Amino acid sequence: MRPAILRERDVPIPLPDGVVLRADVYRDPAAGPRPVLLQYTAYDKANWASVYGVINPERAVDHGFVVVVADARGRFRSGGDEPFRPFAGSGEDAAACVGWAAAQPWSSGQVGMYGASNNGVPQWQALRRRPPALRTIVPHFTASEYDSGWVWRGGAFQLGFNLWWSLANLAPDQLRRATARDGAAAHQDTARALAGALRDPDAAFGRLPLTDAPALDGIAPHYREWLAHPPGDPYWHALSARDALSATDLPVLHVAGWYNVHLDGNLAAYEAIKAAGGPAAERQRLIIGPWTQWSPALFGDACGPERRFPAAIDMEGLQLAWFAQHLSGAGGPELPPVRVFVMGVDEWRDEREWPLARARATPWYLHSGGAANSRHGDGRLSRTPPEGPQPPDTFRYDPRDPVPTRGGATYLPNPAANSGPMDQSAIEDRDDVLVYSSDPLTGPVEVIGPVHAVLHLVTSAPATDVTAKLVDVHPDGRAFLLCDGIRRVTAAEVAAAGSGPVRVEVDLIATGNVFLPGHRIRLEVSSSSFPKYDRHAGTEDGTATAPEDLRPARQTVVHDDRHPSALVLPLVPAEDPAEEPAP
């Protein structure tokens, strides 16, 4: 008979500075002390998705755990007068919550943490402080450093995610708290602007300068702080947990998604711990599924609006088994070091390491007769390098008419309908998108691992952006996005090249896909993906204060024998098969 489950609401957790957090505790009142699973959330402990989206507390109680879901400082039911700032201070508070949970009479003193997206941040921040009772963490879809792994990408600002997440996920509760504290009149302009931005997010994305975000005035100071601190700034180093990774002794179950906006941050944390060879290096596990940032069936069949993967996996059961092993000393089968979902053949694969040792970084070279514009042009991808001169390809980048974002690793309005593997055919009809495609494949081509493009660019602008996408073209012409990247080319790089091309390496992060016979491998090259990334203004520093500051640029991609531009793919040889597919 299933035990009765007690849910204690708004249990106080006092912090050392006197602030009181509020938590909901799920437990079996008839049981003795048990290990605790802690989620420290910025997303409301009363919200169904926040509570049940990663682990069902009732199932966890059935498996012998106590579950504590605590609202973060400055969020929802918890105390704290200052506006919530993502990353800042979450480590001290999360570590205090770990200590509190370990000291309760219903606790065995062993604590594990879990949670996705921003709820993964306090896990890494707690790891920096290593409270004695913390035994393991299971961060989903998150990062341990926040400039390159969260806010910026390739030097560009991740406008779509940063602004929409701030507007939709953070600002409403921040406005509620500020209004309760100061009165409605004090924040009426912000309230009006927020309602307008949520109603018409495209207008919010298009505002210039980027700091012009009236919907966040007085309630979300982090947004302008982020814009004021470019990647590599000491501001980010102070927030990062990266330095703690090499010395950690904690086992970590890393959960990532091919179409998740934080995939690069997920992989960077895993790789950093493994590369350091420290006490926890062999106790890391990595799972990568075909998931987006927000999937309606996150661990069931993963689906975008246009393509579906039969990716059902009992991720909840895997997590509970992991926690039983590391908090209770339970036996049972070990997870493989790496488990990845391979798209195309649509199967789970167990691997020994990440990146795969047997994968070979293989260039596919760009060729054309000088007219690779759009999917109707003459751009080709080939394993054969260019011989002698080739005419370059040129397009006009206009920041007033940027290439629109369509799917991929995004978090934009209506995320279920605008993320994941979406057809890029309409994008590829544009003349400001260069398209290079292989011949139809005669056999399967397996690609698992990091992806990048090396491009040789001449620009008429003092500085610019280069974007790249890897696409799987089906025999019926549909062109599904696998991964993408951006690289902000600086004025110093352009000046150093003189009249010649700048060598630009664009990091597309990673994918796991088998291109099936009859399919084609495709690379798209352009200079924008808006609103995923902010528009480069064509100015020396890339910024604009008003639309009239936006300057078009003539972009030329060179691909001759002296400047061999290429898409570099991690090919898995067919004669060296992977381990057995996962059950």
Label every model-predicted segment:
Residues M1-A30, S437, L441-G443:
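N-terminal cap/lid segment of alpha/beta-hydrolase-fold proteins
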Residues G89, Y114, V121-D189, W258-Y259, ...:
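A catalytic-pocket lid/entrance helix-loop region that shapes and gates access to the active site
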Residues D264-Q284:
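Active-site-adjacent alpha-helix of alpha/beta-hydrolase-fold enzymes
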